[in-house]
Amino acid sequence: DETYRDFDSRPGPPHDLFTDPGWADTLIQLYSFSKAYRLTGHRVGAMVAAPARLAEVEKFLDTVAICAGQIGQRAALWG
């Protein structure tokens, strides 16, 4: 979860997890546009994962009603 990575002033990437050859088997990266672009309360984010992991996540999302409001989605696209 890299929700607060934009508040870290150290130079360079926050980690080297994606350099591990087996990252696709276990790693899911989460990011929050809500924090980075000050979209407080709009719950807009992104996920980076291997295609197989994303397919599993999509199965879950098909069973729950989760959606950021349109204002937050548009602000994230604009930001």
Q: In which residue ranges do the predicted regions lie?
A:
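PLP-dependent aminotransferase class I/II
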Residues: 26-79
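Short, conserved loop/helix-junction motifs that constitute active-site signature segments
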Residues: 20-23
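Conserved PLP phosphate-binding loop immediately N-terminal to the Schiff-base lysine helix
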Residues: 1-18
